Every structure is written in C-alpha cells, then in structure tokens.
Amino acid sequence: MAEEHVVYIGKKPVMNYVLAVITQFNEGAKEVSVKARGRAISRAVDVAEIVRNRFLPEVRVKEIKIGTEELPTADGRTANTSTIEIILEKP
C-alpha cells in the first residue's frame, strides 16, 4: 500500500478524518490505513466505524495491527505509547 493512502489521527474533530478517508476511497484507493497513537486510538476506531456504518457500507476492515512505540521523554527516559493501524478495504 502506498504511503499516500494513510490517514494519521490527531486532535482534530472526527469528521475531518472521516472526510479524509472517504476522499481517499473516492480518488480510487483500494485500501486506506488509519493510524493513531495513545489517546487518539479511540478516535481512530470511531473514524473507521463511522466510515463503515454511515458513509461507505461496502468498506470492510481488512486488518488491525496494534503495537507499542518507545518515545523519548523530556527528562531523557523513554515512555511506551500504544499504537493502532486499521486497514480499510473497498472491494
């Protein structure tokens, strides 16, 4: 999957990310990856579910990957942060 078919979830409203995913599919993408870290994980799940249930019912979840990233903190230690990648597929 090309890197341009990735939507990174942050602090913006959920519908901004939903629109980004729908735009990717409308431009011909067969798969779109929704990625998030930490507190944005629940927002990523919301984005995937809103796309599937409200806007594009033919889209399905192909794969869900979860993991942990070690991020450096201001005082030199490392903090573990959870990550998720939800791959949506349009048949």
Curated annotation (Swiss-Prot):
GO biological process, one term: chromosome condensation
GO cellular-component term (any): chromosome
One Gene Ontology MF term: RNA binding
The record's account of how the chain is modified after translation: Acetylated. Acetylation at Lys-11 decreases DNA-binding affinity.
Subcellular locations according to the entry: Cytoplasm; Chromosome
Residues modified as N6-acetyllysine: 11
Pfam families: Alba
Keywords for this protein: Acetylation, Chromosome, Cytoplasm, DNA condensation, DNA-binding
Classification via NCBIfam families: DNA-binding protein Alba, PRK04015.1
Functional note: Binds double-stranded DNA tightly but without sequence specificity. Involved in DNA compaction.
Official protein name in the record: DNA/RNA-binding protein Alba
Organism: Thermococcus onnurineus (strain NA1)
